[in-house]
Design a protein with these regions (language model features):
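Small-residue hotspots at the loop-to-helix junctions and early N-terminal turns
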Residues: 61-72, 149, 153, 216, ...
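N-terminal transmembrane alpha-helices
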Residues: 22-54, 58-59, 75-87, 119-123, ...
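Transmembrane alpha-helix boundary and packing residues in multipass membrane permease domains
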Residues: 38, 42, 53-54, 71, ...
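Short runs within selected transmembrane alpha-helices of multi-pass transporters and secretion channels
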Residues: 85, 155-174, 182-190, 215-231, ...
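Helix-terminus/linker motif at the lipid-water interface of multi-pass membrane proteins
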Residues: 46-65, 134-143, 199-210, 269, ...
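Small-residue-rich hydrophobic transmembrane alpha-helices
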Residues: 64-124, 163-182, 294-360, 391-414
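Transmembrane helical elements of multi-pass membrane transporters/channels
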Residues: 33-52, 155, 222-226, 230, ...
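Short alpha-helical transmembrane segments in multi-pass integral membrane proteins
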Residues: 1-35, 92-159, 207-266, 322-387, ...
Length: 484
């Protein structure tokens, strides 16, 4: 018996083989229509971010380090907005699964109103305390880097209301099953960001440009264009289930729906903010290791995010698929589909990471020609590939759990793993033992490992479906009266 025959017999004996036709239907009819546009959207966002980094990197290493430090704080705020966006996505998907369009519209409208007002308040506070924030984040970075980081932060906080509108509006459209419109809007937004930022930084024709200031200003302008596009799409009813007129934003709020969104969004936002705050703290560890290490760490995260794109798209798709299935009471289907998405992500991402790791130096050369920075990037990308098999259990599974409105478990696990592993292990290995940026990243991988074990256990035990008991017959809930 040759090897191929033996492998064929092993495959034929698995449960997957007997259900391969249903998995094929699931992949092409459920996963692909959702995940591919989300993947393309995320790819466009990240690629435009890479190009933005290129634009800034030509201004020098200090400029790139300044943007990296300011963006490490901006990520905390964007993570909070994305968490509320997730709550909106789940409520919209669940409501439309029950064919309750009115509730989906009200959830979208009220999320947009609340988060826009909150973003204005947040931007005002951060603008006022910007210098103290940068001093805290930048640690022992040079005075020049801190000054550039403060300039970039003060410009980008002006875009927070627009970012909130774009994120929440896009999330609502995805929850309604329309992933193409967010792709077009966010893709166009990022292309505009490159064009506008390029002109503002380096000038056009005889105009010399604004230099470093143009980077933050270009991002802010493009975000407001994206916010206007989202509001216009919702106003004209491009997706009939989410037609929201401009005057409806001034109607009274319905707090029962707000609390439903926040019931998912607040635990998810606490998780995201604590996670990104912990990540920010680890960036502070790196900030004292020199400009080359700061830049190399920033570039390595950018490349790793590109490698993880398919997994991020599958995670977003799993939230929508789970919410839809549970909205119509298909509990077993929700469980089967989450397992399928998880294994698809695990195998796919591991293959991508291992195939791209040998080209880490080539990828780094697109960002910089500094040999010290490139050396840091190569080491970190190889480490990322080594630990990639546990990434999907850490990130795709909790995304699916949130579609089942099981957000609190992910919050507590993230708090434990972030502060118990990433921060503590990163500090001990990176600072106390002198391992440098490698020790900080080993703390991150310890965080992944703890998350992977706890989330995988949650999946196999079925406890993430605790709100949907199988033993009891499904009861029809009386829909509350919702006013638009």
């Amino acid at each position: 018996m040759n090897i191929s025959s033996a492998l064929r017999q092993v495959v034929h004996g698995t449960r997957w083989h007997s259900k391969r036709k249903s998995y094929k239907v699931l992949f092409w009819r459920e996963i692909t229509p959702l995940a591919v546009p989300i993947f393309m959207e995320n790819a466009c966002v990240l690629l435009m971010g890479v190009l933005s980094t290129f634009l800034v990197s030509w201004l020098g290493k200090d400029a790139m380090a300044g943007v990296g430090l300011a963006d490490s704080f901006n990520m905390v705020i964007m993570a909070f907005f994305a968490a509320i966006d997730l709550g909106t996505t789940v409520v919209v998907a669940f409501s439309l699964g029950k064919r309750d369009r009115r509730r989906a519209r009200v959830a979208t409208r009220q999320s947009l109103v609340i988060m826009t007002l909150f973003a204005v308040l947040l931007a005002t506070l951060i603008h006022h305390f910007g210098e103290q924030i940068i001093d805290f984040v930048a640690g022992d970075a040079t005075t020049e880097v801190k000054a550039l980081a403060l300039t970039y932060l003060e410009l980008t906080v002006l875009s927070y209301p627009a970012a909130a509108i774009t994120l929440i509006g896009s999330g609502a459209l995805r929850g309604a099953g329309n992933t193409k419109i967010p792709l077009l809007i966010n893709g166009s937004l990022n292309i505009l960001n490159i064009i506008i930022s390029g002109i503002l930084i380096y000038g056009l024709f005889s105009w010399p440009g604004l230099g470093f200031v143009g980077a933050g200003l270009g991002l802010t302008i493009s975000r407001y264009i994206g916010a206007v596009a989202i509001l216009w799409v919702l106003a004209i009813g491009f997706n009939p289930a989410l037609r929201i007129s401009l005057k409806s934003y001034f109607k009274p709020l319905n707090f029962s729906i707000i609390w439903e969104v926040m019931g998912i969004g607040i635990p998810a936002s606490v998780e995201s903010v604590l996670f990104t705050s912990g990540r920010l703290l680890t960036q502070m560890f790196v900030a004292g290791m020199g400009t080359s290490v700061i830049a190399g760490n920033f570039i390595a995260f950018s490349i790793a995010a590109l490698i993880n794109l398919p997994g991020s798209a599958l995670g977003s798709a799993s939230t929508i698929i789970t919410g839809r299935r549970l909205g119509v009471g298909q509990i077993a289907q929700a469980e089967i589909q989450l397992r399928h998405v998880f294994w698809l992500s695990t195998l796919g991402l591991t293959a991508i990471a291992w195939l791209t790791a040998p080209f880490a130096g080539v990828m780094a050369s697109f960002y910089t020609q500094d040999p010290q920075v490139k050396h840091v990037v190569v080491i970190l990308i190889w480490l990322n590939a080594l630990f990639m098999p546990i990434w999907s259990a850490s990130w795709v599974l909790p995304a699916g759990f949130k579609g089942a409105r099981d957000a609190r478990y992910a919050m507590w696990v993230s708090m434990l793993s972030m502060w118990g592993c990433r921060v503590v292990v990163g500090y001990v290995q990176g600072i106390m033992l002198g391992w440098g940026v490698v020790g900080v990243w080993m703390g991150m991988f310890a965080d992944w490992a703890v998350r992977a074990v706890l989330f995988y256990w949650r999946m196999v035990t079925g406890r993430w479906l605790w709100k949907y008991p199988r033993s009891e017959p499904q009861k029809c809930e009386k829909k509350p009266v919702v006013s638009e």
